[in-house]
Swiss-Prot record:
The organism's place on the tree of life at top rank: Eukaryota
UniProt gene name: GSTO2
CDD domains: GST_C_Omega (cd03184)
Role this protein plays: Exhibits glutathione-dependent thiol transferase activity. Has high dehydroascorbate reductase activity and may contribute to the recycling of ascorbic acid. Participates in the biotransformation of inorganic arsenic and reduces monomethylarsonic acid (MMA).
Signal peptide boundaries: none
Enzymatic reactions: RX + glutathione = an S-substituted glutathione + a halide anion + H(+); L-dehydroascorbate + 2 glutathione = glutathione disulfide + L-ascorbate; methylarsonate + 2 glutathione + H(+) = methylarsonous acid + glutathione disulfide + H2O
Pfam families attached to this UniProt entry: GST_N_3
Active-site annotation: C32
Domain GST N-terminal: start-end pairs: 22-101
Protein family according to the UniProt entry: Belongs to the GST superfamily. Omega family.
Protein name per the record: Glutathione S-transferase omega-2
Tissue: Expressed in a range of tissues, including the liver, kidney, skeletal muscle and prostate. Strongest expression in the testis.
Entry's Gene Ontology cellular component terms: cytoplasm; cytosol; extracellular exosome
Species of provenance: Homo sapiens (Human)
Keyword Transferase: yes
Length: 243
């Protein structure tokens, strides 16, 4: 398996060759939360894969043959099949590969996890808007209040279930699908938005003990370096921290 810490490909780069038999390829970017979702599932299910990182400020021309809008993540199989959108990609991996199933077998429980994901849908946008506001020196009181309310809604679910994880007594797909945005709260400077949610904070602590989550934790100083360059519109941001 090629590591996640590979330099990005940008305009003028040559496209990678065919995906080797027995592997699946992920087109990714080290700091992207949506790609992070799919990488968590690849790791949790111990799926042999290779990583091709894409420079999102300087996308290769050929990459638009992988995704019509140039988004990440995209999975590519050795049969040249392409699967994109992070939740769809994660569900594909869970269905297509053996090992522990991350989505529940029970149809209702699977549906319940997908409904919970819908309740989470405002969080990615709000976290990004808070980050941009703080980085640009803008007032973000209302944004943070809105984010706190979303976290209060998630807190209520954990309290009602009386479980550590959103999927129950152990980690399942829904926990991995939510996690990337919670890992970023500290480096984004908005960790205080969960100060009022003890059950959610307990979930965050429990997630950090998971071997899959631990394996993909990003060094905070490297993440900060990426953000510093990203907000300077520096195309080298995506390779920050690599030799």
């Amino acid at each position: 398996m090629s590591g996640d810490a590979t330099r990005t490909l940008g305009k003028g780069s040559q496209p990678p060759g065919p995906v080797p038999e027995g592997l699946i390829r992920i087109y990714s970017m080290r700091f992207c939360p949506y790609s992070h979702r799919t990488r968590l599932v690849l790791k949790a299910k111990d799926i042999r894969h290779e990583v091709v990182n894409i420079n999102l400020r300087n996308k290769p021309e050929w990459y638009y043959t992988k995704h019509p809008f140039g988004h990440i993540p995209v999975l590519e199989t050795s049969q040249c099949q392409l699967i994109y959108e992070s939740v769809i990609a994660c569900e594909y991996l869970d269905d297509a590969y053996p090992g522990r199933k991350l989505f529940p077998y029970d149809p209702y429980e699977r549906a319940r996890q997908k409904m919970l994901l819908e309740l989470f849908c405002k969080v990615p946008h709000l976290t990004k808007e808070c980050l941009v506001a703080l980085r640009c020196g803008r007032e973000c009181t209302n944004l943070k209040a809105a984010l706190r309310q979303e976290f209060s809604n998630l807190e209520e679910i954990l309290e009602y279930q009386n479980t550590t994880f959103f999927g129950g007594t152990c980690i399942s797909m829904i926990d991995y699908l939510l996690w990337p945005w919670f890992e970023r709260l500290d480096v984004y400077g908005i960790l205080d938005c969960v100060s009022h949610t003890p059950a959610l904070r307990l979930w965050i602590s429990a997630m950090k003990w998971d071997p899959t989550v631990c394996a993909l934790l990003m060094d905070k100083s490297i993440f900060q370096g990426f953000l510093n360059l990203y907000f300077q519109n520096n195309p080298n941001a995506f390779d920050f921290g690599l030799c």
